[in-house]
């Protein structure tokens, strides 16, 4: 069965790399994958979106991902972006956040949270003043959806950065996996 994942964040948070790492992890598990970003000529801090398709079979569909199964929001500061647009009714929204949002804000979808910013700051994953939360969110996604294993996420991270950077990001992914907070049915 094919699953679609849409990532939302701001330039500099690692949205595109998150999509690439998820695709690499799924590929390591023998799954069919597609990964593609969507952004304009914006700079660091501007909204960025990336998409991933994961399937047990080769993917022959080539086009935009309008109805994802899962949406991952890396930035808690995307006020002007409707992150739930097109999210399937049985979909899951993974949010980088600490407090409870108003129940009507994400009406009708399952919501899972992890305070990825706090974890990133604690681990020193900060670049130019931005907490880089992508690998933390991937760990949480692995636990929430079981689309890929945490081990595959960590292997993809270490393949991309085979040094201390990889070790720190693999640790970050595990913390995202372990510190994921419960699923709520909003609305």
Language model features: what each stretch is:
Residues 1-187:
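Active-site cofactor/cluster-binding pocket
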């Amino acid at each position: 069965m094919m699953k679609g994942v849409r990532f939302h964040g701001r330039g500099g948070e690692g949205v595109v790399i998150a999509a690439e790492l998820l695709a690499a992890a799924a590929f390591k598990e023998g799954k069919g994958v597609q990964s593609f970003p969507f952004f304009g000529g914006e700079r660091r801090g501007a909204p960025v979106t990336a998409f991933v398709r994961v399937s047990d079979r080769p993917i022959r569909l080539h086009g935009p991902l309008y109805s994802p199964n899962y949406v991952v929001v890396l930035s808690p500061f995307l006020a002007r972006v409707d992150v739930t647009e097109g999210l399937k009714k049985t979909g899951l929204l993974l949010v980088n956040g600490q407090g409870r949002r108003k129940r009507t804000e994400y009406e009708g979808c399952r919501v899972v949270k992890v305070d990825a910013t706090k974890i990133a700051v604690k681990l020193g994953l900060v670049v130019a003043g931005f907490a880089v939360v992508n690998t933390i969110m991937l760990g949480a996604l692995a636990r929430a959806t079981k689309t890929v294993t945490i081990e595959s996420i960590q292997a993809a991270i270490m393949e991309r950065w085979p040094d201390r950077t990889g070790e720190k990001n693999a640790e970050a992914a595990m913390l995202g996996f372990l510190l994921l907070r419960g699923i709520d049915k909003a609305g």
